[in-house]
Amino acid sequence: MDSLLTLPLAGEARVRILQITDTHLFAQKHEALLGVNTWESYQAVLEAIRPHQHEFDLIVATGDLAQDQSSAAYQHFAEGIASFRAPCVWLPGNHDFQPAMYSALQDAGISPAKRVFIGEQWQILLLDSQVFGVPHGELSEFQLEWLERKLADAPERHTLLLLHHHPLPAGCSWLDQHSLRNAGELDTVLAKFPHVKYLLCGHIHQELDLDWNGRRLLATPSTCVQFKPHCSNFTLDTIAPGWRTLELHADGTLTTEVHRLADTRFQPDTASEGY
């Protein structure tokens, strides 16, 4: 938990980050989730990014990398980004199995670090909101105490906080019951540290950009199936898979953009009522 990744980027005016989330890979590459072959959609996303891969200083993978909790699924994830020069850090989602995830990704040379120092101005902290076996999230007392310690010992660093589950309602009642259950406790910790201005999550398979008590909360599309916004019941969207790029600036500001495939072949089974 205390492992640290340091990116010595002194003199850089900005840091570019690639976020990939909710790949939902299987041990068998031919398998599909809700009608979408997740390996093929992941590969299509990576192929769209690849011409620009030299631009990124860091890759962040924000959970649900595997659908079937297999070691092979995590190996496939690592295989996909193996040619990217930027280091990758990760956190678990509700579908992940952490023993297999940790082992397979570490064997592939992917860092288990949950704290990243970027140059002299920024840090990224990755939180584990998984409650194993259920879809909702919660931050343990240990996680909250760890977060408070790390924020307190680097008050001079602008901070980007990563977690899988969304702490604010996304506007989908079926999905919001699977949000971060103790968001109030997280808010209490963050209220002490005004240098935390940005939070980034996955989980909801859609784009989100909200204000949370003066902090900017961002969520990012999945590389496979998409959930339709503002729906009371489980509803799939036909919009293409996506990813997010972020730029961290020395003055503490953040700029970001969501990208989607131009490819329209990854259409889900819209008759599905859940998974």
Label the predicted regions.
Residues 14-27, 122-131, 160-162, 216-221, ...:
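Active-site-proximal beta-strand elements of phosphoester/diester hydrolases
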Residues 2-5, 44, 100-115, 145-147:
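Alpha-helical scaffolding within the catalytic cores
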Residues 21-41, 67, 97-110, 132-141, ...:
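Acidic/histidine-rich helix-loop elements
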Residues 61-82, 97-110, 172-174, 208-213:
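Metal-dependent catalytic neighborhoods of phosphoester/phosphodiester hydrolases
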Residues 2, 189, 211-275:
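Binuclear metal-dependent phosphoesterase catalytic core
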Residues 1-76, 170:
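N-terminal active-site segment of His-dependent metallophosphoesterases
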Residues 45-58, 136-216, 252-255, 264, ...:
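His/acidic metal-ligating clusters that form di-metal
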Residues 22, 63-64, 93, 164, ...:
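Active-site glycine-centered loops adjacent to acidic/histidine catalytic or metal-binding residues
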